[in-house]
Amino acid sequence: MGRIKVCNFGRIMLKIFCWTTVILSIYLILGFTGCYEKWFGGPAGIVKAPVYWLIRAGIGIIVESIIFWIGIIMVYATSEQLGIRWRVLGIVCGWIPVAHLVMLHIIIKTVGEEVRMEKMRAKRNLQRKAQRICSTKYPVLMVHGVFFRDFEHLNYWGRIPAELEANGAVIYYGNHNSAAAVRDSAKELAERIHQIIRETGCEKVNVIAHSKGGLDMRAALALTDIAPYVASLTTINTPHRGCQFADYLLGKIPGKQQQMVANTYNAGAAKLGDINPDFLAAVYDLKSEKCSEFNNEIKDNPDIYYQSVGSKLNHPASGRFPLNFTYPLVKYFDGPNDGLVGEESFRWGQNYQFLTVSGKRGISHGDMIDLNRENIKGFDVREFYVQVVAGLKKMGF
């Protein structure tokens, strides 16, 4: 909560700045016009006593500047919800009369909502701390999707793992390549699960897999020997039936251009730690035809609990880049979608949850892993995962 305390102090300083600026302005206007002399026999106006009022105006401006800069630096340095957009607009509009007041109001309001949310969350976690509602029988393995890696200082899952751990969960990560064929990723994940079993002595793991990671894990359970070591698989926005828009793009883009993109990606991924990354193999395994073949071959294990989650955006403009651009294309081919995957592709297993919120916002593919660390009205992504894991605990997993 240290960050939130600093953020809240900055917000308070900005509110103080607003009120004291109004008071100072009224004080100086009345003083400049000689009202104090007329009403109380006080100091004369600025025409008769310019030095007197210029000194006071200068002191007031200096004090107000100090209050403002302390506040704005604190909220800019600590707020997660301001994001790049509001920070940049705040800087730009700071030089524009009237617009700077509107932006200051937005900044104070946004930070205030963030502070209230985090305080509420901290209070709730404190109240249920003894219950350890996410302390499952088996640890949780979180499996990333395509084109991402598990970095130590840039968590793929945003603020979610910390929230789960605060409620008693033990978390591990897949640590597999960012781009590979489903079957190759399956082998990597099988090796990772064996490693966790060896090093910790746990009997099994509960897997939560996002996007292509869900296909990777289904393949691992069916094609490798790790099924006895997995209690449950929860897939998040996984394209179980593929992506028809991917079929279209791959059919339209010439092979030469595809290979150029693949070579560029593979070279970059290798520098970041991937071993033999394969961009095209990963992408082609997401085609609807490939997923249909995959589903005919890969069968669920009756001894493992499978469940799935999906979500959708309500409007293209509500998604963050690049999902705001891909949404219309995906909608044309796949219908309602999360910016990448169509609604019809999400459902898998014994239990299925489909998530959205009212209004234009919706919940994107990236929102489901807290990619932008954004608090969405009507959907608390961190608490959602807490309840998912708490549900696994209640089921004995």
Please name every model-derived segment:
Residues 1-153, 397:
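Flexible, membrane-associating and regulatory peripheral segments of lipid-active enzymes
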Residues 154-155, 243-249, 317-322:
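Short aromatic-enriched loop/helix-cap "lid" or pocket-rim segments at secondary-structure transitions
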Residues 157-160, 223-226, 250-253, 325, ...:
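Glycine-rich, phosphate-binding/catalytic loops in enzymes
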Residues 144, 171, 187-294, 338:
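Serine-dependent carboxylesterase/thioesterase catalytic core
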Residues 132-204:
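Active-site catalytic motif of lipid deacylating hydrolases and related acyltransferases
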Residues 141, 172, 232-234, 307-309, ...:
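Hydrophobic/aromatic beta-strand patches that form the interior of the parallel beta-sheet core
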Residues 134-135, 225-228, 298-302:
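Extracellular/periplasmic catalytic domains that process cell-envelope and extracellular macromolecules
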Residues 51-62, 89-92, 300-397:
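C-terminal catalytic-base region of ester-bond hydrolases, centering on the histidine
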